Amino acid sequence: MRRTSRRKAGTIVAAAVLGLTAGCGGGGGAAAAPTPHASKTITVSSTAFAEGATIPRRSTCDGENVSPSLDFGGVPGEAAELVVLVEDPDAPHGTFVHWVVWGIDPHETALGTGELPNGAEQGRNSFGKRGYGGPCPPKGESHRYVFSVFAADAKPTLPKDASADDVKRALIGHTAAYGTLVGRYGR
């Protein structure tokens, strides 16, 4: 009986720890969906900026506010579609979402500046709009912007105004490969 009680106590403690950590970081709102992970890697790059470098003004709120070009390689054959998320993990009130795109043909190897491929859908960003919203940190701050590309092994069913959390939940257990490119922007 003691072993059973210890197991139950251990399970309760583990559940409590998971429950407490699941709610961390979102600025008081609902807990963010976990980021899907995969064993295979997609290479993500841009002709507009290098890993860790400054995102061009053109792709920010201070410029034309158009998405930068993205190139990706290593997409596995089992991919049904690609998904792109752009997030600012340095935002003062938790991760700020700048772009949510799904339905990209897995044979695409690039997105041009300001382009959205045929058949792709854009979800709701943290500005409350569908589409790309460029980096726009508070004056005097420099933030990181994570451009994530996911290869989904099944096409997720999502509403037209899906959020990044909706997309992440749909990708759990369906992510064949994943890659990121991080850029910076300061004002």
Located regions from the model:
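N-terminus-centered regions that define maturation/targeting leaders and the start
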Residues: 2-187
